C-alpha cells in the first residue's frame, strides 16, 4: 500500500474524520503529507498531526489550491500600491444545498460547512493580513435532522485592529469572492476560491469613485 511504498509524499483525500489517522501514519512512515482541506476537525487533532510530522522530520501542507492562483499575487501587489493601510476583509463562499447523500452532510465523516467551506475565506483572510487571528466570534446554523452546520458567520480579530468578516453556507445562491477595504481604496474578486484552469477571472479596484477591472488570464493552480 501507499504507506509502505517507496514514495516521498502521500496525498490524503479521505473524509475529514480520517485525516488525523492517515496523516500520522504517513508521517511515521517518513513521507511528506499533502492533506485535503480541512486538514482536521479539531485543534487537538491538529496538534497531534503537527507533532508527528515534526518528530518524523516531514512536512505537511493543507490542500487549499486556490492560494496558488496568480490572481492572489496580483491582489497583494494592488493592495501595496493602491489600498495602502488595510482595514477589513470580507469573505463569502456558499452554494445551493448538495444532495442529501453527499458526504458534506455526514457529521461522522467531518461534514458541515465550517470544515468544508468556511476554511476558504478564513485562509484568504490570513493570507491578506499576513498574520494569525487573535480571537473569533461566530454563529452556526445547524440542520437538526442531519446534525451538521449548514451556514456560518464569523468575525475574526487580527493584530493591529484588523478584522475579517466571513459568511459561508450550503443553502445559498452561489458566491465565491472576497473584498479588502483599505484606507485609500477597495478591491473585490469575481471568483476567488474555485476558478477552473480554462477560465479567466477579474479583480475590481474601487478608487476615486471609479471601478477598474483587472483581468486575470486562465491558470492551472
What are the language-model segments listed below?
Residues 179-221:
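C-terminal glycine/acidic-rich active-site capping loop/insertion
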Residues 1-34, 38-52:
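Beta-loop-alpha module in the N-terminal Rossmann-like domain of NAD(P)-dependent dehydrogenases
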Amino acid at each position: 500500500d501507499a504507506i509502505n511504498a517507496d514514495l516521498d509524499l502521500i496525498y490524503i483525500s479521505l473524509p475529514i474524520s480520517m485525516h488525523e489517522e492517515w496523516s500520522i501514519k504517513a508521517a511515521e512512515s517518513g513521507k511528506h503529507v499533502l492533506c485535503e482541506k480541512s486538514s482536521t476537525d479539531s485543534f487537538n487533532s491538529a496538534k497531534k498531526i503537527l507533532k508527528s510530522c515534526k518528530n518524523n522530520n516531514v512536512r505537511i501542507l493543507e490542500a487549499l489550491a486556490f492560494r496558488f492562483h496568480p490572481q492572489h499575487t496580483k491582489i497583494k501587489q494592488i493592495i501595496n500600491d493602491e489600498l495602502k493601510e488595510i482595514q477589513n476583509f470580507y469573505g463569502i463562499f456558499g452554494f445551493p444545498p448538495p444532495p442529501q447523500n453527499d458526504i458534506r452532510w455526514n457529521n461522522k465523516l467531518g461534514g458541515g460547512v465550517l470544515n468544508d467551506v468556511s476554511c476558504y475565506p478564513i485562509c484568504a483572510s490570513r493570507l491578506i493580513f499576513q498574520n494569525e487571528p487573535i480571537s473569533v466570534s461566530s454563529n452556526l446554523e445547524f440542520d437538526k435532522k442531519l446534525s451538521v452546520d449548514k451556514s456560518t458567520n464569523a468575525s475574526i480579530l487580527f493584530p493591529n485592529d484588523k478584522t475579517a468578516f466571513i459568511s459561508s453556507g450550503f443553502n445559498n445562491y452561489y458566491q465565491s469572492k472576497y473584498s479588502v477595504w483599505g484606507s485609500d481604496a477597495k478591491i473585490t474578486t469575481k471568483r476567488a476560491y474555485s476558478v477552473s484552469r480554462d477560465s479567466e477571472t477579474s479583480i475590481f479596484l474601487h478608487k476615486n469613485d471609479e471601478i477598474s477591472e483587472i483581468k486575470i488570464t486562465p491558470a492551472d493552480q
